[in-house]
Amino acid sequence: MSMGGGSNHEFGQWLDQQLVPLATSSGSLMVELLHGNLDIWVKEAKHLPNMICYRNKLVGGISFSELGRRIRKVDGEKSSKFTSDPYVTVSISGAVIGRTFVISNSENPVWMQHFDVPVAHSAAEVHFVVKDNDPIGSKIIGVVGIPTKQLCSGNRIEGLFPILNSSGKPCRKGAMLSLSIQYTPMERMRLYQKGVGSGVECVGVPGTYFPLRKGGRVTLYQDAHVDDGTLPSVHLDGGIQYRHGKCWEDMADAIRRARRLIYITGWSVFHPVRLVRRNNDPTEGTLGELLKVKSQEGVRVLVLVWDDPTSMSFPGFSTKGLMNTSDEETRRFFKHSSVQVLLCPRYGGKGHSFIKKSEVETIYTHHQKTMIVDAEAAQNRRKIVAFVGGLDLCNGRFDTPKHSLFGTLKTLHKDDFHNPNFVTTEDVGPREPWHDLHSKIDGPAAYDVLANFEERWMASKPRGIGKGRTSFDDSLLRINRIPDIMGLSEASSANDNDPESWHVQVFRSIDSTSVKGFPKDPEEATGRNLLCGKNILIDMSIHAAYVKAIRSAQHFIYIENQYFLGSSFNWDSNKDLGANNLIPMEIALKIANKIRARENFAAYIVIPMWPEGAPTSKPIQRILYWQHKTMQMMYQTIYKALLEVGLDGQLEPQDFLNFFCLGNREVGTREVPDGTVNVYNCPRKPPQPNAAQVQALKSRRFMIYVHSKGMVVDDEFVLIGSANINQRSLEGTRDTEIAMGGYQPHHSWAKKGSRPRGQIFGYRMSLWAEHLGFLEQEFEEPENMECVRRVRQLSELNWGQYAAEEVTEMSGHLLKYPVQVDKTGKVSSLPGCETFPDLGGKIIGSFLTLQENLTI
């Protein structure tokens, strides 16, 4: 028995797409929307054909079966294959929603595998595709189709069904699949009817690897630093005033106070970065110096960084790499110290084809951003505290809510200039402002973040000549053997009677190639809520957390994310792209259902003006094209609901859903008569000025890059992590990710019976204060139409100021995303502004030929 199947280039994409090249019904079937959950059992198959018989055709004198035997021998697998190695994929609208494990050498396999799957798909059938696993490419044995019309009755459909071949006939006499399937629509699911943080008894997100942990505390951060007094005060319940956290200062303080361990994961970790920046005080050490000092004090310091395959370091030769993560430079800095740095490549799964392994190792990354330390606890003991979010400890990330373009180049951002969108320098600018979200977990859930680090560290293997000589197996401290460090069961930092206590849950996108500790037995893995992929096990709990929170939302959703694309199965074209995450469709259907119920609801989504890089480049134009398709699908879903209830003449889709971006503009001397550029009253010749740089200096404007990965629901639930809203971050087999979701049980709608005003309310209001420049009472009720229209009005005014010829100082940064949405939900270019100011590139993107998995 093994997990998942082999590669399948012939019939579909790797994990998320299953094209069915045959008819399972002789007549036309009605397309139905399934929005809810499918409860599925794939039980067993009988009398499957022996697929080896179909493969014994010669290729260069070698039969397919012999070729497969040789491949398995190279991979170290047993080569005794006499018949089919069957497994089953379950798909709807071409999107794979479930996959059984492989049973080797069996024509009568028994799986007895259960799936409880969220769906938001329009389809005529649910397909059960029986396949034969093989190293040179899985083959479809046959298909069973269950009409969605039958499922909509709500009755359980079960029994033995004939497995049909490409001719619509049984693939073999007596070939049958035993299955059971039942559809439960959203309106009948109690799990989603009481809100996200439904009181003390809430169980969190069910079916995940890490459970909900009660009795914690959470600190929420916006940007790397917030100066005192720069944002308006926000008053919370209980007479408390919201405190704006100082993320990097808190992280530096946590490092200094650590006595036992400091564990860091990152997409990038850069040793020269300064976490504390007050008046550019040179006495504040760099991250690298701080970690070396702590290591010399006896603290175990482990740093786990993604190994960019394009960066290399050999004696006398080194390359930075395409992604500029400085991984090799950081490794060299710590080489002769007691700080242990492990550059961790992204590896493909065992049994994957060479093409698939190459794709994983060159395209996908380790994207988690965490720091775990021991901290002071009661009775002279220590406890585990964890930081989780979107901020890497590297250059270009430090910023404040002011998001200056030019004014901090010689102070806060001296030696930390970052703008990869076009060629410019720190002498000239503008820098790329950076907006991000982060969190600190104090309590039992911090131990799950620690467990994630330990599982990843044990699975990581260095790459390259000389990198494998040191053993990393004994580097991890055995926490359970250190008496002064509290264990998980002792770690509660607050009880349920404390009004400031939190319930927190840790989520991941990761697979068994990147962790050590997942169960070997696929059936046991199912009990740990892991999914089967092709020869791997998958934790997709970040996606599950987003879906559960959106479905439970009763009032509003506020999202900040670096990317926003998905639900391609419901686009008007490119349905088979494979960007199958449910998040955009779930938001659109949530709004549509609220419209039908004639209840207020609003979604606010903040994204970057464009993905980082040259907006005219092929990859970015293609991402923008997918983003446009996603927006179009959502707005049209909302318009259909308005039309259905007869409100299309009174309301429009933007009364419920709005997209925004962030930008800034700074007044200052632009160009002096002799052609030099005046920066800080010190004229300098710009090095080889280019058109984009000249235009940006003239206009004194630039986007604020939204790197956030977070969501607030109903001011009672927050989700913050490293995952973007795209397939790369949510599928579990691509980029590795981590996130936290949490709420305060005493500050929920269920507990109060009215609007909660706890820490999450304060956080969301503080973010709005940063983006809009001030607060109004209307902002306290985001679901109300008055608030939606007011925020949109302000964002349109800000966009007008940003795009104007005249340079004026901007007090608000929230810009209406520059597309036009008409009353029928059609999304098109903004008249007179089809391309991005200064840098160009179509705002709605272009369909360009490029490897799809790179851009979704």
Curated annotation (Swiss-Prot):
Induction (UniProt): Activated by wounding, heavy metal, methyl salicylate, osmotic and salt stresses. Up-regulated by aluminum stress.
Residue ranges of every copy of the C2 domain listed in the record: 21-161
Description of the deletion phenotype: No effect on tolerance to aluminum.
Reaction(s) catalysed (UniProt annotation): a 1,2-diacyl-sn-glycero-3-phosphocholine + H2O = a 1,2-diacyl-sn-glycero-3-phosphate + choline + H(+)
One term of GO molecular function: phospholipase D activity
PLD phosphodiesterase domain boundaries: 362-397, 702-729
Keywords: Calcium, Cytoplasm, Hydrolase, Lipid degradation, Lipid metabolism, Membrane, Metal-binding, Repeat
Location(s) in or outside the cell: Cytoplasm; Membrane
One CC-aspect GO term: membrane
Activity regulation description: Inhibited by neomycin.
Entry binding sites for Ca(2+): 223, 403, 435, 770
PROSITE patterns in the cross-refs: C2, PLD
GO terms under biological process: lipid catabolic process; membrane lipid metabolic process; phosphatidylcholine metabolic process; response to oxidative stress
Cofactor binding summary note: Ca(2+). Requires micromolar level (PIP2-dependent).
Cofactor(s) recorded in Swiss-Prot or TrEMBL: Ca(2+)
Pfam families the UniProt entry points to: C2, PLD_C, PLDc
SMART domains xref list: C2, PLDc
Entry EC no(s): 3.1.4.4
Transmembrane annotation, as ranges: none
Topology in the lipid bilayer: Peripheral membrane protein
Catalytic residues (UniProt): 367, 369, 374, 707, 709, 714
Major enzyme class: hydrolase
Family designation: Belongs to the phospholipase D family. C2-PLD subfamily.
Stored PANTHER family: PHOSPHOLIPASE D, PHOSPHOLIPASE D GAMMA 2-RELATED
Domain note: C2 domain is a calcium-binding fold, and the binding promotes the protein association with membranes. In PLD gamma, all the calcium-coordinating acidic amino acids are conserved.
Protein name as catalogued: Phospholipase D gamma 2
Lineage: Eukaryota, Viridiplantae, Streptophyta, Embryophyta, Tracheophyta
